[in-house]
Regions:
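N-terminal entry segment of cytoskeletal motor ATPase domains
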Residues: 1-177
Length: 177
């Protein structure tokens, strides 16, 4: 019922932080990632959809790319220039809101969602929308302790989560009485 006080009991609730916040370990790994703004790119791949690569040579409308990540790692191939897309700087890896990405293309969106999923960060914003990638596992992110993280916080003050959306909706509803 609206306006009802909920008692927050955190005794048996596990810490949701590893499933909500980008850890220092992840940030360190991202900072060490090699990146060349002129050569780093994504290219299409039949199974993985996109692979990261480095542009080695451009000849007219053809681009020679050495794959640096994925099942083709180490392989060099030639692609049409329109199929080669730019990679965001590493500081945008595991980005909480994809509307902040420098290069907003299919590969960048899929890469960011995949990276967050691998790190067990299943919620991501895309502007006004909250994207959830279902891990088909139970994470301790729907507990009273997690509710406490999001209670009375604005969406930009906490990591992406459906509770942030709910809190914003509740706050707006209370203001528009």
């Amino acid at each position: 019922m609206p306006g009802t006080k909920i008692e927050l009991k955190t005794g048996d609730d596990p810490d949701p932080a590893p499933y909500l916040f980008v850890s220092d370990e992840i940030k360190k790994r991202i900072a060490e990632k090699p990146y060349d703004p002129k050569r780093s790119c994504y290219v299409p791949h039949p199974e993985e959809k996109f692979c990261e690569g480095m542009i080695e040579e451009t000849t007219g409308a053809k681009v020679q790319v050495k794959i640096v990540k994925g099942s083709w790692e180490g392989k060099t191939d030639t692609f049409k220039q329109e199929l080669v897309t730019q990679v965001n700087p590493p500081k945008y890896d595991c980005c909480e809101d994809m509307s902040n990405l420098t290069y907003l293309n299919d590969a960048s969106v899929l890469f960011n969602l995949k990276m967050r999923y691998v790190e067990r960060l299943i919620y991501t914003y895309s502007g006004l929308f909250c994207i959830a990638v279902n891990p088909y596992k139970r994470f301790p992110i729907y507990t009273m302790r997690t509710v406490g993280v999001y209670r009375t916080k604005r969406r930009n003050e906490v990591p992406p989560h459906i509770f942030a959306i709910a809190e914003g909706s509740y706050h707006s509803m209370c203001l528009s009485k």
